[in-house]
UniProtKB/Swiss-Prot annotation:
InterPro entries: QueA, QueA_dom1, QueA_dom2, QueA_sf. It is found in: Cytoplasm. Transfers and isomerizes the ribose moiety from AdoMet to the 7-aminomethyl group of 7-deazaguanine (preQ1-tRNA) to give epoxyqueuosine (oQ-tRNA). It comes from the Bacteria. This is S-adenosylmethionine:tRNA ribosyltransferase-isomerase. Keywords: Cytoplasm, Queuosine biosynthesis, S-adenosyl-L-methionine, Transferase. It comes from Salmonella agona (strain SL483). One of its GO terms (biological process) is tRNA wobble guanine modification. It catalyses: 7-aminomethyl-7-carbaguanosine(34) in tRNA + S-adenosyl-L-methionine = epoxyqueuosine(34) in tRNA + adenine + L-methionine + 2 H(+). Its main location: cytoplasm. One of its GO terms (cellular component) is cytoplasm. Monomer. HAMAP family: QueA. Pathway: tRNA modification; tRNA-queuosine biosynthesis.
Amino acid sequence: MRVTDFSFELPESLIAHYPQPERSRCRLLSLEGPTGALTHGTFTDLLDKLNPGDLLVFNNTRVIPARLFGRKASGGKIEVLVERMLDDKRILAHIRASKAPKPGTELLLGDDESIHATMTARHGALFEVEFNDPRPVLDILNAIGHMPLPPYIDRPDEDADRELYQTVYSEKPGAVAAPTAGLHFDEPLLAALREKGVEMAFVTLHVGAGTFQPVRVDTIEDHIMHSEYAEVPQEVVDAVLAAKARGNRVIAVGTTSVRSLESAAQAAKRDLIEPFFGDTQIFIYPGYQYKVIDALITNFHLPESTLIMLVSAFAGYQHTMNAYKTAVEQKYRFFSYGDAMFITYNPQAISERP
């Protein structure tokens, strides 16, 4: 399959730079997987679409202020984007500089350049950086870091983004991008869903900066997926198996929840799904056999991205591309701060190719 098969024309004006004032008031495009039928509504329509006993699986990762500015002690400006916190003193990061720093290079970080760090090693495209500071890494990031807004949100981060670019249920710091489907859930909607009898479970996948990396090959099968850390604890496994046993649906909130659950299912030795704690490089594209998910809540994704490929594998290629064409025509808002989709599984998708 060619990467260009997943291209579509998107006017710049449809890229959302700010979220809706009220999280759950965004628009919702529903796609019925088996038929391709589309319906237009608002996000709170989920209350009618979900049944008592259905299981929503959220990603409870919390975005860290992962972008740091500063300079090398020798003078050149640098920008650091944390990919992963290794421990209380060290990070793995992307570094943008006129000349890549060598191991041993001293860095002065923060607007006042008061934080001292050392680049200690290089791992492929990533740099290992150690802070020379008594505080834990997370405290340093909270003090001097900027929220790592995606590259297509063409504005500086603002103080408000520290909360707006978080899900209301975020709990475990470690992501450098928000699991954006979850941004639409507010406390009143969550309470109403619980009241209806909808079950909820939480996985953790710390979204890495690799999520924004373009696919740089022509053929999908040649793409090597970036690695991210995921946790699917026993209570999530129990909730999934219980939902399946009683004939209810497992509904993933976002592609990161999909990748977590499907990683746990792939690694399972005996059951449909078993606990999973570790790095995943799962790459889902047309031809993939879904094992766990019955429905998906997700935002609108970039052309030629691995995420639109994941959606195509779930709903079918033609249904997905037609839904995106309709979304553009109907002026839905795209990407992280944009509108959402509710998609049910298309069992025929596995045999469909572009």
